[in-house]
Amino acid sequence: DWSQRKKGQPFFAQIQTPGGKLRGKNVEGWNKIQATVEKALGSRTSSNAVRLPPYYPRHPDIVQDWAAYLDSVRMTDVMVGEVIARLEKEGVRDNTLVLFMTDHGISHGRGKQFLYEEGLHVPLIITGPKIIAGTVREDLVEHIDIAALSLAAAGIQIPQYMQAKNILAND
């Protein structure tokens, strides 16, 4: 918790949210996250609102899993929003590099364990000083690159043996 640092001292915080893991792996888990979301946000994603990719059958279990996934994304958005609000309240938001990412793509039917697009597409959103809002890059990024970026942001030289690159470097 960065609140214990000296005033003006730089900090590094890695905050993990449960994300899609909130939804569980079965009907019981799906119902639980949807009830939590409904209590917290006043509504849950309706099965009727779910738009599946064309290669998924519109089976009730798949639709409910997808709805629960969408609700877990909504809860993640709230959690991330709370962190951003705290940074703003403490007056450090404009001078803080914030990275948002997941460890894998959507884990529906085929997504996580096989080489399907939804499992390979991993979000990475970066905001902070010198980051132009709305910029979209097509770079191939590996999770190890986040370590290199973090070291560089802290002014620490990236070791030569590290198989990573600072994705924000000019080169």
Please report, for each region that a protein language model flagged, where it lies by residue.
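Active-site-proximal cap/lid insertion segments
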Residues: 2-147, 151-170
